[in-house]
């Protein structure tokens, strides 16, 4: 993902947070910048706020003890609103004004707890006070007591069925408060409690608070905050019910914008739109009340806090390495079943996949939820079959758009690393060679390379030698992966997509989507190191291909993307210049002749069509092995029989059905027809052919351990 895309995603999250969440997120990020960056940001902020008269008025009121004292005569609703707008503007060191705030806060919190109202605003006030540089250790100690009261109050009302939903109460802030107690009144790495979050003291910049991760305690971590911002790991969610007089400050279930894949459908229902987000530890919102003894995660509206459950009380498989359960909270959220996250946090991956309605009924799960959970788990069990279906579709030359969308959604579902009961000697003997020579390109089986070699050797004579399929690679090409090896099946499909991208016409959208998918796989714990090395090699090859196209080619693709060349039939091969001739002006047409410089036959034999296709037709009926290779040949020859990629064994121009004689230099560069010579300054076709041939050869030699051949 490019930097601008990352900024766009972050901006999308940021817009969805409320002011309190935004403040905490920015404070967390500011602790990661250098002194120069911090000073620059300070200058920018001071400059932009210099003429903000309204802010100066609010700041004056926020630091006036007399005005704050008068708020005690106002209604509780108005006082809460005033505190939310003025407390963040309190200047560190203004002890008199701070004392007035500390008098008001207990009264407001007591009223909120007693009447079970304004819980969201109360939590925001507590968060502001806890992260404010003006508060002392004693102040935070008093505020922690109110957190306990909020916990007790909502716990008492949890069993009442006559009460509606309340926003979650953060038990975990008490835990983090104790960490803050060890910081000697140093907040977030600034030594002096009078230092604000922006005003930086250069001499104290590196003074990090003990007991705080990365020098900062993230008191808030909303359900929409990405894992890279939250520095504390996620816990399961406990949402406690109460009266439904909560704050109207409410945001949607998820504020994360969709993935950068335009018009992405829901596919087979793996995830809903709100869960098409970057992978990472996710915390849960408070739209429903889970049956959970665990700590809660911030509800929507307040952004709340992300916290850890007391490790001595219960097991949490969501946080266990290699459990395959890390993505269960996000998966449940996409199904709107996240209220049962605590129930799943006590299960292993195998127990979850074997759940029945009877077991769920014993856990007091409602009938509708039981049915939905069982159906959703059944869909998880069908993922491997779906991957096989996608693999067949890709091999048959179908569109890559839908498979990529399915893969994007599937990678967000719970996936556990496959552990084979026993490793066969054949696999063990093949593993060293694969590890020593990881394939750098998109992996194909030896069948395609053998076919390519035979075609190359027959380039001069115009014939085709029958390809030989090695026993090892032939087995890999037909043998299915073990049942349950979802990462292996996923990797195999990714290889098929890579092959398709390398040999079909450039599609920037598909390439970008594929690279994003690779990034998710590379950080997923379910994939083995061997699989990740293979995925990384495919990423490097696709990136190399992406960079090899002139920028104009990618920009012009949208002009002809919808046009199809009849000569290609159903082939997904490179489009010819005739398919876009109508969309591009033919000014100053020229007739290009083949120059004396030729690409070596070992490279071009792969694309020689006349002998390739005819020989393939002659041998198909008599040789079942070659019939298995029929789909492989589709990648390199025109199944419709047109001479769209003739061999370059001639020295004169020959008119073909798929490419007119009169073309523009732009068309020649875009489609790189091997029968016509490109200018010496544009050697893209040579580079691409070399890369493709080298790719096939190296992948055939490196085929091995995890049985993820791309053919």
UniProtKB/Swiss-Prot annotation:
- The PTM Phosphoserine maps to 168, 420, 573
Enumerate the residue ranges of region (Disordered): 278-323, 422-448, 565-588
> What stretches pass through the bilayer?
none
According to its UniProt entry, the protein's GO biological process terms are: positive regulation of translation; regulation of mRNA stability
Could you tell me which residues carry Phosphothreonine?
424
CDD domains reported in the protein's UniProt record: SAM_Smaug
Q: Does the keyword Iron-sulfur apply?
A: no
| Tissues where this protein is expressed | Expressed in brain (at protein level).
**What function does this protein fulfil?**
Acts as a translational repressor of SRE-containing messengers.
What is the protein name for this chain? Protein Smaug homolog 1
Gene it is expressed from:
Samd4a
